[in-house]
A protein has these predicted regions:
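A short beta-strand-turn-helix
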Residues: 57-78, 102-105
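N-terminal targeting signals for export/organelle localization
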Residues: 1-57, 210, 216
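Thiol-/selenol-based redox modules, centered on thioredoxin-like
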Residues: 166-216
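Sec-exported extracytoplasmic/periplasmic mature domains
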Residues: 103-107, 133-137, 157-161, 185, ...
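Short, small/polar residue-rich loop motifs at catalytic or cofactor-binding pockets
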Residues: 53-55, 77, 172-174
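Structural microenvironment flanking redox-active thiols in thiol-disulfide oxidoreductases
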Residues: 93-155
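Structural micro-motif
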Residues: 141-142, 153, 157-166, 170-178
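Short active-site neighborhood of thiol/selenol oxidoreductases, capturing the structured segment around
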Residues: 69-98
């Protein structure tokens, strides 16, 4: 793990990229690793995100135990992220950023949120449902999905994130919030731990408010 972090830092120093990207960006990533109370962040250049999320096949189970096809999300813009429920610090900060976005919008303009688990072996529907309750993520507007293991690499490519098994059952992963358009394509991404609420709000208004969802 230390060797991987050292390599990332070397890349930052050699390319001049910031260690913690800010704002809504394309094609770069802030790597966040958590083990216990420890966080590390580094920047690593990446290609723009891959295939549309809604074109990814696989088995996705939501917090209520329903099997979902990502193609069913096509037609309505949404905000996507990736978390895992045992994450001690990075993921709660991501969820807090999503709540800030939600509170900044009138009820009728608020997005649908889709959060993919990076720890499907542990994050069963029951665990995801408990997490949703404690984090105030009410269905159906907040959808927490447990992907099958084979689908995770495609999800990571679509969101533009990197992840790997960490220490003590943790997951080293990129902190990312993505704005997804009605075709299922990631249009813009906010990366790293230094979230920019104004930029995220502007991106949603520009891309996501082409369709409205009914209030909860």
């Amino acid at each position: 793990m230390l060797a991987a972090v050292a390599l990332l830092v070397w890349r930052v120093l050699s390319t001049g990229r910031p260690t913690e990207p800010q704002g809504v960006e394309r094609g770069s990533a802030g790597m966040a690793s958590a083990s216990g109370s420890e966080e590390r962040a580094a920047g690593e250049g990446r290609e723009p995100a891959g295939a549309p999320l809604t074109s990814i096949a696989g088995r996705f189970t939501d917090q209520d135990g329903h099997v979902r096809a990502l193609s069913s999300l096509r037609g309505v813009p949404f905000v996507a992220s990736a978390i895992y429920t045992r994450c001690p610090s990075v993921c709660p900060r991501t969820v807090a950023a999503l709540h800030r976005l939600d509170r900044s919008l009138p009820v009728g303009d608020r997005p649908r949120y889709v959060l993919f688990s990076l720890d499907p072996a542990y994050d069963t529907p029951r665990v995801l449902r408990a997490f949703a309750a404690t984090q105030a993520l009410p269905a159906p507007r907040w959808m927490l999905l447990r992907p099958d293991t084979a689908s995770l690499p495609a999800i990571a490519r679509a969101l533009g994130l990197a992840y790997s098994a960490g220490e003590g059952g943790g997951v080293a992963h990129t902190a990312v919030i993505a704005i997804v358009d009605s075709s299922g394509s990631v249009r813009e991404r906010q990366l790293g731990l230094a979230q920019d609420p104004a930029a995220l709000l502007a991106a949603w208004r520009r891309i996501g408010m082409t369709q409205r969802l009914p209030a909860d």
